[in-house]
Amino acid sequence: MKVIGFNHVTIRVSDLQQSLGFYREILGMDLIHQGRRDVYLEWGTAWVCLMEKKGERRDDMAGLGVDHVAFTIAEEDFDEAVEKLREHRVTILRGPMERGGGRVINFLDPDGVQLELYTGSLEERMKVWE
C-alpha cells in the first residue's frame, strides 16, 4: 500500500464555538464546512475536523483530543490494504465502506491510536455536503 499523503486529523473538543474561534482567529484556518457538531477547517494543505464532545461528567470529557489521523491512499490500493489489515488481525472499528466521496476504513494501531485510510479528497467530501 502506498500512502499518497496526509488526509486529515479529527480533534474532539468540549466547546465547538470556542475552539472554532481559536483555530480561525489565532491560527488563521479557513472554515470550509460547518455542521451541527463538527466543523472542517483548511490550513494550507492541511485539513482539520473539530468534533464537539459534550459531557457533563468529568469522565465524559476524557475523550477530548485527537480522535483519529487519516491518510489518503489510491483507490486501486484500497482492497489490498483492507486485506492486509485483516491478515494481520488488526482491530477494525468501521468499514470498509463508502463515505464522503471515497472509500474508508478505520482501525487501531498496536497502542490503540485510531487511524483511517481514505481514498477520496477534501473536494469530494465537500460535494457530499453541498
Which residues are covered by each model-predicted region?
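N-terminal beta-strand motif that seeds the catalytic metal site of vicinal oxygen chelate
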Residues: 1-17, 69, 121-130
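Amphipathic alpha-helical segments
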Residues: 17-30
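Short secondary-structure junctions
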Residues: 28-33, 92-95
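Conserved short beta-strand elements that form part of the metal-binding/catalytic scaffold
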Residues: 30-63, 114-120
